[in-house]
Amino acid sequence: MEANHSEQLSAERQSTPPGDSSSLPSHNGLEKEDGQDSPTPVQPPEKEASVHPDISEELNRQLEDIINTYGSAASTAGKEGSARASEQPENAESPDNEDGDCEETTEEAGREPVASGEPPTVKEPVSNKEQKLEKKILKGLGKEANLLMQNLNKLQTPEEKFDFLFKKYAELLDEHRTEQKKLKLLQKKQVQIQKEKDQLQGEHSRAILARSKLESLCRELQRHNKTLKEEALQRAREEEEKRKEITSHFQSTLTDIQGQIEQQSERNMKLCQENTELAEKLKSIIDQYELREEHLDKIFKHRELQQKLVDAKLEQAQEMMKEAEERHKREKEYLLNQAAEWKLQAKVLKEQETVLQAQLTLYSGRFEEFQSTLTKSNEVFATFKQEMDKTTKKMKKLEKDTATWKARFENCNKALLDMIEEKALRAKEYECFVMKIGRLENLCRALQEERNELHKKIRDAEISEKDDQSQHNSDEEPESNVSVDQEIDAEEVNSVQTAVKNLATAFMIIHHPESTPHQSKETQPEIGSSQESADAALKEPEQPPLIPSRDSESPLPPLTPQAEAEGGSDAEPPSKASNSPAGLGAETQCEGLPVGAQADQASWKPEAEASGQAPQAPTEASLQKMEADVPAPACAAEEHVAAMVPACEPSRQPPRAAAEELPVGASAGPQPRNVADTNLEGVD
């Protein structure tokens, strides 16, 4: 079908004049679209094409007979007529969507053989076709223009649009050039065809002779054309009915569209009303805005006035500030002068402070000599230092403070004298304790020897008694032995308890708040009473034990007359025995002193020996008085108690009563007690 359509276009271009050929190349792009749209309406002519070839064959046969009869000249004319006859059914098959196309093709097919000698009748259908083609081309151009505009709208930048148009123009130029070449070829063909036409016109005269024979053929063709016309009329009627249906449908759609348009018009009216209302609201808002602007202008004016007032106040304040600054400068100068004066005064005070510090160093050098022994004087020194720090701040009161310090210095000297006296007493006490410890060691050794001898004797006696009475009194011996052993144990326990009590009373130290050498006389009757209580304790062996010993179960022998004799011989020198109550009096005096003085007493011994020889006279006098007051039996009782002490040594447990009754001063001077402990351990 496309080939037939292209042949029709070529025939139309041959019929068109050369002046109109320039308008055709630009429409080649739409010819393909027409060729694509053509197959849909071409379906009914295909049935006609199946009928035409039979008639054409019969006509060809008849023409061959005519050509054979009329010779070679007529044969060429017959061939041309057959070619044109073959072109007629092809022209009838061309696709035309319009209603009058089928009728025109049938009329042309019937008129061409009749009016073959009249050329103007042939050009009329060609011109009609050209007009239709031009209309189609214009329609196609509108579609192409729309497509171009759409493609251009898709692009964003003008450069891209320009590139797209340039490409399109290049394509159209190529097509135009190809079509011009085709046009030249067609023009050449047209010249040839015109030459042939001239020849055919010469031969046309010859063809008239064959007209008679061809009339019959024409009649048959007319009959055939009538049938075709009837069919075409039927088709036209059907198409008219279809058109009517389409028009009715189109009218219904138009009515719907009109209804929609009316609805839209109503909506538009509503929108217009809303727009008018909004415009009125906007006007009211604008009026309010103008009123607010006027109000704001008034407010701004009021604020400007306030700002002017504030500026005036600021100027006044600045003037006041300037005056205040001037005053401040004056005060600053005055204060600087005062500061310079105060600095000078401070320098003077610092010089005075250096002088006073020199004096303080002198005093501190004097007091450092006493710091090694007087631990309690550290507190006095601390208070003294605090007062000296205060004196740096209170320079006006230095004279009064110096007077007070002088008085305190005298008091300290008196206290030092007292301490020297106490030191002498303690030295004598120490000697007494050393003597006592030596005696106790000797007694312990003697008692241990006696104990061992007694144990041996008891064992020998038991063995002999067992051997004698083993045969006769086997049942009575255990009872008698048990009774004897119990009596011995009870005696030993009582003797140990009395010895412990005597030791406690012998080492008793009475506490007194004040330590003066005058109180030693007051302590003497107390010591005598304690010695009397010790003697009473010796006479009362039946008292319950106060301090249990670990080795109380072990039998201890009673004291022998030899031990008592030894104790008496050791107690003969009365001067040594008289030192013990003097030592107790000294201990009572030491407890009146602070703890620091007792702790630093050891360091004062060489100094007291070197510098304290002069004040020993009153201490010796007091000792002689104490020796005269204390009776000799007291010393003997103490030695007797000391002789009983070694019985308690195996227990290795110190008496609790003595430990609890010892004062703080006894713990401050631990040297003589340590020596005694080491000696006792050696005895054990």
UniProtKB/Swiss-Prot annotation:
<dbReference type="GO" id="GO:0019905">
    <property type="term" value="F:syntaxin binding"/>
</dbReference>
<feature type="compositionally biased region" description="Acidic residues">
    <location>
        <begin position="93"/>
        <end position="107"/>
    </location>
</feature>
<dbReference type="Pfam" id="PF09728">
    <property type="entry name" value="Taxilin"/>
</dbReference>
<feature type="compositionally biased region" description="Polar residues">
    <location>
        <begin position="613"/>
        <end position="622"/>
    </location>
</feature>
<feature type="region of interest" description="Disordered">
    <location>
        <begin position="1"/>
        <end position="132"/>
    </location>
</feature>
<comment type="subunit">
    <text>Binds to the C-terminal coiled coil region of syntaxin family members STX1A, STX3A and STX4A. Has a preference for STX1A.</text>
</comment>
<protein>
    <recommendedName>
        <fullName>Beta-taxilin</fullName>
    </recommendedName>
</protein>
<feature type="modified residue" description="Phosphoserine">
    <location>
        <position position="474"/>
    </location>
</feature>
<feature type="compositionally biased region" description="Basic and acidic residues">
    <location>
        <begin position="45"/>
        <end position="64"/>
    </location>
</feature>
<comment type="similarity">
    <text>Belongs to the taxilin family.</text>
</comment>
<feature type="modified residue" description="Phosphoserine">
    <location>
        <position position="483"/>
    </location>
</feature>
<keyword id="KW-0597">Phosphoprotein</keyword>
<keyword id="KW-0175">Coiled coil</keyword>
<dbReference type="GO" id="GO:0005737">
    <property type="term" value="C:cytoplasm"/>
</dbReference>
<feature type="coiled-coil region">
    <location>
        <begin position="378"/>
        <end position="467"/>
    </location>
</feature>
<comment type="function">
    <text>Promotes motor nerve regeneration. May be involved in intracellular vesicle traffic.</text>
</comment>
<feature type="region of interest" description="Disordered">
    <location>
        <begin position="514"/>
        <end position="632"/>
    </location>
</feature>
<feature type="region of interest" description="Disordered">
    <location>
        <begin position="646"/>
        <end position="684"/>
    </location>
</feature>
<feature type="compositionally biased region" description="Basic and acidic residues">
    <location>
        <begin position="458"/>
        <end position="475"/>
    </location>
</feature>
<feature type="compositionally biased region" description="Basic and acidic residues">
    <location>
        <begin position="514"/>
        <end position="524"/>
    </location>
</feature>
<dbReference type="InterPro" id="IPR026183">
    <property type="entry name" value="Taxilin_fam"/>
</dbReference>
<feature type="region of interest" description="Disordered">
    <location>
        <begin position="458"/>
        <end position="485"/>
    </location>
</feature>
<feature type="coiled-coil region">
    <location>
        <begin position="135"/>
        <end position="351"/>
    </location>
</feature>
<feature type="compositionally biased region" description="Polar residues">
    <location>
        <begin position="1"/>
        <end position="26"/>
    </location>
</feature>
